[in-house]
Amino acid sequence: MAFLPMNIKEVKARGWDEVDFVYVMGDSYVDHPSFGAAIITRVLEDCGYKVAVLSQPDWKNDADFLQFGKPRLGFFVTAGNIDSMVAHYTVAKRKRSDDAYTAGGKNGKRPDRAVTVYSNIIRRLYPDSVIIIGGLEASLRRFAHYDYWKNTVMPSVLFDSKADIISYGMGELQTIEMAKRLSEGYPVEALYDIRGICYAVKTSDYVPKTVVELPSYERVCESKKDYAIAARKELEEADAVRGKTLIQRHGNFILIQNPPMQPLDTKQLDYVYSLPYERWYPQCYEKLGGVPGIQEVLFSITHNRGCFGACNFCSLAFHQGRAVRSKQSVIDEAKSFLNDKRFKGYISDVGGPTANFRLPSCEKQKKAGLCKSRKCLAPTPCPNMQVSHTEYLDILRELRKLDGIKKVFIRSGIRFDYLMEDQSDEFFEELVKYHISGQLRVAPEHCSAAVLDRMGKPHIETYKKFCDKFYKLTGRMSKDQYIVPYLMSSHPGSTLKDAVELALFCKRENIHPKQVQDFYPTPGTISTCMFYTGIDPYTMKEVYVPKTEEEKSMQRALLQYFIPENKQKVIKALIKAGRKDLIGYDSKCLVQPMSNQNNYKGNNKGQKSSYNSNKNNSRNKNGKQTKDKFAKYRRKKK
């Protein structure tokens, strides 16, 4: 094994006179299958192509882009693992100081809108080269889209970047096919029938076909209703089984999106994860302190891709297909860890976007794709959904048996609503007994039914039942474990009254969020469509959207009502929401009046501020109940 060449010296050391492809990326180079760039470059290498990696080139100087010369076949360009604007800015649009995907962890090594900047430089320097853009930034900006940072609707990134093609989604199969045709001497136009790509033609050259036409760029700029219609159609056709070709007019050009590429089957996915990854970063990064993003995933295993949960704020349904690896492939990867002297016996995760999905959502999905008219899990599970953890459980059991494996953890998100639909408790029991490292992260996100409906999430009753069962099992097994709930403020549909309801829920359930995630409007999601338009694209009804910094800060403060610094904002929010009854000295109140500010100790005196105080208030080491946060449910059952 060896890292791919990162500079002309390393290219010459391999005896190459030229490279076939230059892969330009906005992250530091990490050769690990949790990083998309590693997968695509290793797939190209395995197909016999000479690939050079140009990692975080200096965009203010042409030298980095010139060092390899013009590649024989073309350039692949990606911003990296995440959108460069999300990497650079907080939801409050403040510049971040750190960057998990950059050596040394410092921000500033890639430009804003990295795909566009890199691609334009390449087009200027190599006017006739083929440029293919991909990854999350390009994929989620493939249509006209709302840009939160400019607060405007922008055209498809294909036009701003001057690239030839967008490879959207996970990318392996279309990359292999595009590379094959280019190597056979075909022009870029000969790639236009490949699934999983977008390209553009002049309106005068367009040959009418059977397609779904979206409202044009000009129309979605002028009409929020048209924007919502476009967003719904984009998602409806983002299915590899039933998705149709989409077109969207941009001035004198037409953007054409071919149907999604079929997801990798199990054999293909096994192949991708069997490639000779170094599972580390090159030596040149050591002096900078390494790449922080590798630490969390170094000894993790991805056993699946995609998610049929389809939360409205998540891009997975729009970006990933759905596929699973074979048990043997997962076992083989775990065995490879045993030969690594850095491995201490702990597998940090066996998961994916959602850890506990292995099956298609239903039999219909295989032949007809996912339904347009309803979600599989929300607001209630579809009666046709097939629920089983048998395959996943079998994999976990085999991993636990391996000599040299001390612990196998699950740190990816568990879909608790799917878990609660399983008629067998076998997986739940083994999850609690073997696979939690003290904390189990799950994502109820909110408690208000109205907000959860806008999110595409199950109602809070399911979460309560899940917690009740979790703590019963935890107590029975004498485990000191607790749940870490992810909660979100200011999602479209969330009023101040909803935020107050969430604060009261946290108080009742003894939840103390250490951090609060404000809704972040990123390109390509239904929730972002709601944020921009104030319209739910599924119902075309108006949606309340908290947009002012004042209200968003009040919603955040309500979730952390127990922090003294938030007291003034909490009081202001409660007054504005018509809930003065929650300001006072009664145990039901969230805060005390401002007149006693100097004496204010909060409602959680003596407790650590943690994600969830269940750590201190669930059960003691003997498994006996201490402060039982679910006592009210148990009393009802007596």
State where each predicted segment sits.
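Glycine-rich beta-alpha loop elements in corrinoid/cobalamin-binding modules
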Residues: 10, 36, 55-250, 257-258
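N-terminal pre-triad scaffold of radical SAM enzymes
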Residues: 24-29, 288-312, 338, 346-348
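Conserved, mostly hydrophobic/aromatic
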Residues: 164, 272, 307, 330, ...
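Flexible glycine/acidic-rich beta-alpha junction loops that bind and position SAM and/or redox cofactors
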Residues: 83-92, 140-142, 172-177, 202-205, ...
